C-alpha cells in the first residue's frame, strides 16, 4: 500500500547523474543481485539512480563501489527484514514458503471498511497515472456534488492484495489519517473514500505538476541552493505538522512529493500515507518499513520515532544539493550496511563550493544518532533556511519531552542545564523564543504547566487524538512545578544531544562549566551524587563515579559536569 502513487509507467527508464558513476558495463561473471519484491525496499526509489542489480545491459551505466572507511562484516540485516515484510503483507509464511494469493492467509479476514459503496455513481475513471506494488492511481472526474466536472486522483487498492489483517489495518489507517490531516497546504487534499467488493477507492486532489524526482532530473540531477531551500521549507512544513499530530510518514522520498501544477511556483504536496503510523512522544515503533535508500539506521534496529522521517529528509536534501545519494550499494544488504556504518561524502564536488550552512544543515539531519538530529521545526529555524521563508514555526513536541525530563531532574542537573543555556547564541535562542511565544506566556513573562496543554489544543486534529499525544501532554500539564520564565524555559527545553552534534559543542561545554563553577558547583560526596542520579545499590558507585568528582575539593569535575548534563542513567553507567 505504500507506493500506490508510484512513478508513472513511462518513467521506468529515468536516470539521475551520480557522482563517480561510470559507463562501464559489469562483467557477465557477476551474478545478479536478488530483489525482495517489496515496495518498502524497492530496487529503485529513484529509478535508474538507485540500481537494484549489476546485471543490466551494457547501455545502462553501472555504479562502481564507493570506498567506505572500513569493510562491513556479515551478517546482513536484509534477510530477516525481507522475511518480516513478507509476513506483514502475506507474501510468504514465516518459513518463506510461497502462499497462493487468496488462499490460506485470507481465511476469516473482514475486508469491509464501512466506506460508501457509491463510487461509480460519483466518479468516472479516466486513465491510469501511476502504479505501485499494491495498487494503482487513476485520474477521474466528478459526476455530481461539489466535485462535479472536477478532475481528481483515485488511488485504487484491490482487496485481493489485502492478504493479512495488518494490510487491511494499514488501508483503514491511511484513510483515517488523510481525513484528519487534510487541510495543510503542502499535503494532498483528501476528498472521500469508497469501496466495493473488489477495491477500495481513495479520492484525492489530482496533482498535475509531476514528482519532485522529475524536477530533479529536468534540472540535470540537482537544484541550486536557493531552489533547494524552497523545496526543503515545504517538506519541513508538512512534516512538522504531521509530527506534531503524532504521525510519522515512514516513506519520505522524492517520488512521494508532487507539484500541484506545472507552474514554476507550484506548491509541493506530500502524498502516500500508506506506510504511515501513529507514534506517541514517549513510545518507539519497531516494524521495519520504508524505502531502502531513505531508511534511517534506527529503523533497521527496530526502535524509532519521528526522527526517522528527518533522516529521510536529510537524504532528500543531499540529493537535491549534489545529485548523488549519500548511501548506496548494488544489493539491499549493502545499502543497509552503508546506512548503518558508512558516512556521507562531503569532500567531492559540489560540496566544497556550497555554503557552510547548507553542509551543516544536511549533516545535522544525517546524524546516525537520532537524538542529535534536528526536528522539523528546528530545521525550519536553521541558519541555512532562516530568511528564505516567512512561515510561522509550529509547536515542537520535543519541547514537551525535554521539559518533562527537566522537571523530573535533580536540582544539581537543573543548575548544570541553566549554565549551559547561558552559552547559547542569539540564532540558537531564536527557535526557543518561538516555542516560548507559542506557549502563550503571561504579561509578566511566565508560563505554567497548563500552558503546554492549552497551546497544543490550538493545533489539534483527530490524528492527535488517535496518536495519544493528548495523553502525554495532559500528563505534563498535571505535573506540579513552579512557573517558568524564558531563562529557565531555555534550560528546560535545551537538547544536550543536539548541541553536542554541533562543531561548537566543546566551547559551549567549557564555558558552561566555568559558569557552573561560579554559581552551581559545590562539594558533593559520591554517595550523595549517586542518590542525586537515582542509582541503585547494584551500581558500584565508587568505581563508576570516581572521575566525576575532583579529589582536590570534592566538586564535580568537567567530565562529571558533561555526563550530568546528559542525565546519565544507571544502565549507561554500568556499561561504562
Curated annotation (Swiss-Prot):
Protein name (Swiss-Prot/TrEMBL): CDPK-related kinase 1
Residues that bind ATP: 129-137, 155
Alphabetic keyword roster: ATP-binding, Calcium, Kinase, Lipoprotein, Membrane, Metal-binding, Myristate, Nucleotide-binding, Phosphoprotein, Repeat, Serine/threonine-protein kinase, Stress response, Transferase
Residues the record lists as binding Ca(2+) 4: 553, 555
Top EC class for this record: transferase
Active site: 251 (proton acceptor)
Coiled-coil annotated residue ranges, if any: none
Record has Nucleotide-binding as a keyword: yes
Region of interest: Autoinhibitory domain: 390-420
Stretches assigned to the EF-hand domain: 427-463, 464-499, 500-539, 542-571
Residue ranges of every copy of the Protein kinase domain listed in the record: 123-385
GO molecular function, one term: calmodulin binding
Major subcellular site: membrane
Entry GO CC: membrane
Residues that bear Phosphoserine: 291, 333, 557
Changes after translation: Autophosphorylated.
Disordered: annotated span: 1-39
Sequence intervals crossing the membrane: none
Similarity field: Belongs to the protein kinase superfamily. Ser/Thr protein kinase family. CDPK subfamily.
Pfam families in the cross-refs: Pkinase
Effect of inactivating the gene: Impaired basal thermotolerance.
Source organism of this protein record: Arabidopsis thaliana (Mouse-ear cress)
Amino acid at each position: 500500500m505504500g507506493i500506490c502513487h508510484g512513478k508513472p509507467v513511462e518513467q521506468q527508464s529515468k536516470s539521475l547523474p551520480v557522482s563517480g558513476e561510470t559507463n562501464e558495463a559489469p562483467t557477465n561473471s557477476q551474478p545478479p543481485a536478488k530483489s525482495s519484491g517489496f515496495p518498502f525496499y524497492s530496487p529503485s526509489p529513484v529509478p535508474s539512480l538507485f540500481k537494484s542489480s549489476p546485471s543490466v545491459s551494457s547501455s545502462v551505466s553501472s555504479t562502481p563501489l564507493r570506498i567506505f572507511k572500513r569493510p562491513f562484516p556479515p551478517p546482513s540485516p536484509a534477510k530477516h527484514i525481507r522475511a518480516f515484510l513478507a509476513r506483514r503483507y502475506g507474501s510468504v509464511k514465516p518459513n518463506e514458503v510461497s502462499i497462493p494469493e487468496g488462499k490460506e492467509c485470507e481465511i476469516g479476514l473482514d475486508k469491509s471498511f464501512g466506506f460508501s459503496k457509491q463510487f461509480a455513481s460519483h466518479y468516472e475513471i479516466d486513465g491510469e497515472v501511476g502504479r505501485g506494488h499494491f495498487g494503482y492511481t487513476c485520474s477521474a472526474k466528478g459526476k455530481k456534488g461539489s466535485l462535479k466536472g472536477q478532475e481528481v486522483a483515485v488511488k485504487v487498492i484491490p482487496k485481493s492484495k489485502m492478504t493479512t489483517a495488518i494490510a487491511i489495518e494499514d488501508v483503514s489507517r491511511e484513510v483515517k489519517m488523510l481525513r484528519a490531516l487534510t487541510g495543510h497546504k503542502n499535503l494532498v487534499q483528501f476528498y472521500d473514500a469508497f469501496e466495493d467488493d473488489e477495491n477500495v477507492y481513495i479520492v484525492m486532489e489530482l496533482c498535475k505538476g509531476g514528482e519532485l524526482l522529475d524536477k530533479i532530473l529536468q534540472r540535470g540531477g540537482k537544484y541550486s541552493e536557493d531552489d533547494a531551500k524552497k523545496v526543503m521549507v515545504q517538506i519541513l512544513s508538512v512534516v512538522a505538522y504531521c509530527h506534531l499530530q503524532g504521525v510519522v510518514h515512514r516513506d519520505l522520498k522524492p517520488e512521494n512529493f508532487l507539484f500541484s501544477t506545472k507552474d514554476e511556483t507550484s506548491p509541493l504536496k506530500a502524498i502516500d500515507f500508506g506506510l504511515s503510523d501513529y507514534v506517541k512522544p514517549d513510545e518507539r515503533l519497531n516494524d521495519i518499513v520504508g524505502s531502502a535508500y531513505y531508511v534511517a539506521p534506527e529503523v533497521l534496529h527496530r526502535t524509532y520515532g519521528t526522527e526517522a522521517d528527518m533522516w529521510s529528509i536529510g537524504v532528500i536534501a543531499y540529493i537535491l544539493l549534489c545529485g548523488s545519494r549519500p548511501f548506496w550499494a548494488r544489493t539491499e544488504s549493502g545499502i543497509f550496511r552503508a546506512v548503518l556504518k558508512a558516512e556521507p561524502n562531503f569532500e567531492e564536488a559540489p560540496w566544497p563550493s556550497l555554503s557552510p550552512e547548507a553542509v551543516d544543515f544536511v549533516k545535522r539531519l544525517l546524524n546516525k544518532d537520532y537524538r542529535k538530529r534536528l526536528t522539523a521545526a528546528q530545521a525550519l529555524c536553521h541558519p541555512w533556511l532562516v530568511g528564505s521563508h516567512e512561515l510561522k514555526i509550529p509547536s515542537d513536541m520535543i519541547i514537551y519531552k525535554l521539559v518533562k525530563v527537566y522537571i523530573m531532574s535533580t536540582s544539581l542537573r537543573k543548575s548544570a542545564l541553566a549554565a549551559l543555556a547561558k552559552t547559547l547564541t542569539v540564532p540558537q535562542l531564536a527557535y526557543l523564543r518561538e516555542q516560548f511565544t507559542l506557549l502563550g506566556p503571561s504579561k509578566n513573562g511566565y508560563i505554567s504547566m497548563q500552558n503546554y496543554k492549552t497551546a497544543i489544543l490550538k493545533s489539534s486534529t483527530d490524528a492527535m487524538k488517535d496518536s495519544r499525544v493528548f495523553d502525554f501532554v495532559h500528563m505534563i500539564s498535571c505535573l506540579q512545578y513552579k512557573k517558568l520564565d524564558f531563562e529557565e524555559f531555555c534550560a528546560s527545553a535545551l537538547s544536550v544531544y543536539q548541541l553536542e552534534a554541533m562543531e561548537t559543542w566543546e566551547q559551549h561545554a567549557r564555558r558552561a562549566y566555568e559558569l557552573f563553577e561560579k554559581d552551581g558547583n559545590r562539594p558533593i560526596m559520591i554517595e550523595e551524587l549517586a542518590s542525586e542520579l537515582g542509582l541503585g545499590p547494584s551500581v558500584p558507585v565508587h568505581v563508576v563515579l570516581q572521575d566525576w568528582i575532583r579529589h582536590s575539593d570534592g566538586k564535580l569535575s568537567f567530565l562529571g559536569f558533561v555526563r550530568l548534563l546528559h542525565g546519565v542513567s544507571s544502565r549507561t553507567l554500568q556499561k561504562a
